[in-house]
């Protein structure tokens, strides 16, 4: 973490390891006072403290957002076609809240998933995002499950450059610790003390490529919270859990751990107009991608901070805009467009998206993408529709432009469970499609083999064992298919679905970066008789 100003241009310079295994970043040190306070608090036993009492007149505003996913520019909300977000608008709205009453302390918290989901995030590995969040005054962020998608070393650099701490009390790394804190106590002169404990979803270890989580372990969050909360609670006015676990785990946490005043959540991309109450603990979440800003106000009553109001502030065309940040975003976007010609890998042969191939039969391109998805999610099976492959990737040097032309739809991976019966139904639908129509719904697969005979499914196996209709299989697919696209209504019955936040295009970029030269081929996983 860097408390010193660093220019965005400097921060976006190439980041290369040097001979001794360290990185070529400048040496920076110095920690805000409230972080040192935090470290002392976690070390002291709970019995040494008595609960702090706020003073009459004390007030506080908490602002929060989550699941930013690199969305620097405004976007169209698919739910209502409204233009939302844009970090220049988000920053100006935060500043507007602060200006309403300069004497009232405002704490800004980010509930995780800074990375993964836009061209600029992929190209610049999150550096513009972390720098601009610092400029808008984020006080603390929880580590999301996508913070390791570009590798541990990238996350370490981002943490060093950030003007705010990343938190996660339940994530550990061996042998080298990750640059995260368990918690912070935010203390400002004359203001209530706010303890913030960070918790990350256990899905961290399955939602990114296995190489990104080498040496990483995730402890059960309820046990961690029970262990650490008493010391934080005893000398603060408000205890906040900054969670990137999703609403189900947040509910379980609220019901299982006493002493929590508020849970600020993320991971589901849910939008709650009012807090969800569990055991009188409010749980809040503010959608995704900076489209909304949550605001909770507190006032001291009878020695305790009491919630007085909650609102979701829309970030849209009616919002103010920070002109300096808007100009910075425009420059970053232009830089990204220039970067599209950058080479990310090498292809030994063309990956063809010819309709007469990828929509009719097994294709090397389909195998490559489906295998990547199954590998990084540890799924049993991967399913992708041939219509999702929009352009071929030529042999030779592979550029970012060629990958984005092949996958322009911004589809993301969805991981869930499907019964064997429904998996077979999906394969039956694919088999029944007339190949002469070049059907976009024809399935490219990984982890299984299926045989088509006279427009019918003649067999389907996983590891030479027939698919068991009663068994549950872990399946990864696109959000398009998971929503029943191309007539695959049976995939809507997927249980425990997780929107991974990982775009197919980003996955393919990472695949070329790490596996080049790529020599995809067919292996008779799909056969027609």
Question: Language-model segments: what does each one mean?
Answer:
Residues 6-7, 14-18, 23-24, 33-39, ...:
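Non-catalytic terminal accessory segments
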Residues 29:
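Cationic, low-complexity basic patches in intrinsically disordered or flexible, solvent-exposed regions
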Residues 41-45:
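Hydrophobic membrane-targeting signal helices
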Residues 49-334, 358-372, 382, 413, ...:
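Acidic, metal/ion-coordinating pockets
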